[in-house]
Amino acid sequence: MLDPKILRQNLEHVVEKLRRRGFEMDSDTFLQLENKRKEAQLAIQSFQTKRNQLSKTIGMAKSKGENPEPLMAEVSQLNDELKQEEANFETIQKAFSDFQLAIPNLPHDSVPDGKSENDNREIRQWGAPPGFDFTPKDHTVLGERDNQLDFEAAAKLSGARFVVLRGSLARAHRALAQFMLDLHTDQHGYEEVYVPYLVHEECLYGTGQLPKFREEQFQVAGDRNFFLVPTGEVPLVNLARDEIIEAPALPKKWVAQTPCFRSEAGSYGKDVRGMIRQHQFQKVELVQLVQPENSYQALEEITRQAEKVLQLLALPYRVVELCAGDLGFAAAKTYDLEVWLPSQNKYREISSCSNCEDFQARRIQARWRNPKTGKPELLHTLNGSGLAVGRTLVAVMENYQQADGHIRVPDALKSYMGGVDYF
């Protein structure tokens, strides 16, 4: 959520920055709501002033032995009018809050202009795509051996965009997640956290998935207002809800492996085969909570930490800076990591690392205590995939495939795979 002070004091600047990301803010509606809010606030103050004055007059009348009942009747009527105006004010505040919740974050000044992923800017590449003396196969074909990648069984259980993994592929999937967690906890200083996979609606409001992306969420039917997590970012960031963290305890660095559940609304016809776009997938998520002045340094750090996974697995990739029009709703700046897939002869997204500045923190009131002032201030929140496990498995299968269809085990994974060289 944007700072209301910025909206009120520098509306034209906000409108212009939002326009960079293709969002047209209805400034007329904002001004109307703001005027109504001010009018209601003034009306409440006026009623309160009149009531206080009448209360004093009643006291004086009683001290003089005069009949206070006419004045008390007037106070009673004022109280009724005050309650009505307070209810009106709450209605206006709710409309104002709903209006704010629909506004995305402002892009950082360093974010390049652009309308879509076609305008994203490549920052760097690492590694060279492998050369094959045979035509490389798609991961779905490679997984057909011994039926280890079974989409038919998954469809029988759950429908399209699910997969059943068996045997060595299931083990490789588990090994990748364990490798990522060990790297981030042992070398990158993250605290591992096990979190619920069902969260309250307010958690999704807190991180920005709601209200705009409701159709992309899986909501649990029943009396309890639960949603399946679309990303580990949601429960991890919400751990700081309504907290005030002392400065020496910062930064907070949390990592979790969670399943992610997405309806993929709007993705009809995209990546219908294989494991690239699924309703359920595993992801290792990195989250940092930092002091505002350190957040862009933290963004570079979290991106490098996600890159380290790909480097240790020797998977070719590139880093792309997202243009303003391709930014996620809550992000002020984002880097995507894209891994090379030989069967597609192109790079595909495998991680997204974002600085949300104080956008999420304002929604969940995640704060730190500034030792200089002694007062609580909003934190900056960052998140990054470190990495999406299924897509990493796809990349390993395709980049390490052999002519006979077997997959060579990356050196970094051998200890997690029982020391075997191929699977």
Curated annotation (Swiss-Prot):
GO cellular component: cytoplasm
Pfam families reported for this sequence: Seryl_tRNA_N (PF02403), tRNA-synt_2b (PF00587)
Molecular functions per Gene Ontology: ATP binding; serine-tRNA ligase activity
Subcellular location: Cytoplasm
InterPro entries associated with the record: aa-tRNA-synt_IIb, aa-tRNA-synth_II, aa-tRNA-synth_II/BPL/LPL, Ser-tRNA-ligase_type_1, Ser-tRNA-synth_1_N, SerRS_1_N_sf, SerRS_core, tRNA-bd_arm
Pathway: Aminoacyl-tRNA biosynthesis; selenocysteinyl-tRNA(Sec) biosynthesis; L-seryl-tRNA(Sec) from L-serine and tRNA(Sec): step 1/1
PROSITE patterns reported for this sequence: AA_TRNA_LIGASE_II
Any single biological process term in GO: seryl-tRNA aminoacylation
EC number: 6.1.1.11
Residues that coordinate or bind L-serine: T231, G232, E233, E285, S385
Gene3D superfamilies on file: Bira Bifunctional Protein, Domain 2 (3.30.930.10), Serine-tRNA synthetase, tRNA binding domain (1.10.287.40)
Binding positions (ATP): R262, S263, E264, E349, I350, S351, S352
HAMAP family for the chain: Ser_tRNA_synth_type1
Role of this protein: Catalyzes the attachment of serine to tRNA(Ser). Is also able to aminoacylate tRNA(Sec) with serine, to form the misacylated tRNA L-seryl-tRNA(Sec), which will be further converted into selenocysteinyl-tRNA(Sec).
Name under which the protein is recorded: Serine--tRNA ligase
Organism this protein belongs to: Coxiella burnetii (strain CbuG_Q212) (Coxiella burnetii (strain Q212))
Underlying gene: serS
